[in-house]
Amino acid sequence: MVVGAKQLRKALASGRAQHVFLAENADPAITEPLADLCVAAGTELTWVASMADLGRACGIEVGAAAAATVAQLRF
């Protein structure tokens, strides 16, 4: 799993993002471009009610605007 807009952008660019979660109450300047990238990449997208909910779901003590499950790299 990756948490945060920068890490999510990297996961989308590399094709590793499998399912993206965005917080509805996060700044649209952050979430809208990420949602557009998800649509362009054909990546599943789920909107979560709040940053606090998404942060808790990710196991962190602060809110998160964005997160994703990612494919593991195989060596």
Predicted regions and their residues:
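Ribosome large-subunit tunnel/peptidyl-transferase-proximal elements
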Residues: 1-17
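Amphipathic coiled-coil/heptad-repeat helices and related helical stalk/stem segments
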Residues: 4-5, 30, 50
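Fold-independent oxyanion-binding glycine-rich loops
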Residues: 5, 24-25, 70-72
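Alpha-helix capping/helix-boundary segments
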Residues: 7-8, 26-27, 53
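Alpha-helical elements of the RecA-like P-loop NTPase motor core of helicases
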Residues: 10, 32, 56
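Extracellular/luminal Protease-associated
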Residues: 17-28
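Nucleotide-binding motor/catalytic cores of P-loop/tubulin-like NTPases across gene-expression machines
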Residues: 28-36
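Short basic, glycine-rich beta-strand/loop surfaces that mediate nucleic-acid
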Residues: 36-75
